[in-house]
Amino acid sequence: MTRHDRLQSEPTIWLATTRPEGRPHLVPIWFVWVDESFYICTERRSVKVRNLLANPLASVALESGTQPVVAECRSRLVEAPYPVEVVQAFQAKYEWDIRSDQQYNVVVALQPQRWLMG
């Protein structure tokens, strides 16, 4: 399976951000791949969002240990209204309308700056 195929089909990525004191924060999270960027939808008050607001650099990895896909990314918050393509991608992949979710209320775009594997 190609990297592009996996970016479209795999259910989760591992997202690594850095806490202000320098410790890593690593979490699995649903994502979509749209226009050469990862998009996640999460809670505005989450640790990952606080970390990314302080330091917009992050790494992401697909789960497979035998065919690793790892990217270093620069993040940015995407305010509502969310891009139609992103909304449609979450709906198609997870049957989830991110526009109507009150808990998961922020979208983060992660633009790969460098692919380390994959």
Regions found by a protein language model. Give the residues of each.
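A generic local structural motif
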Residues: 1-2, 26-27, 45-47, 94-95
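Alpha-helix boundary recognition
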Residues: 7-8, 53-54, 91
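Short beta-strand segments
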Residues: 10-43, 50, 58-61, 70-71
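Generic structural signal for secondary-structure transition and capping sites
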Residues: 11-12, 57, 95, 115
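Charged, gly/pro-rich active-site loop segments
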Residues: 67-118
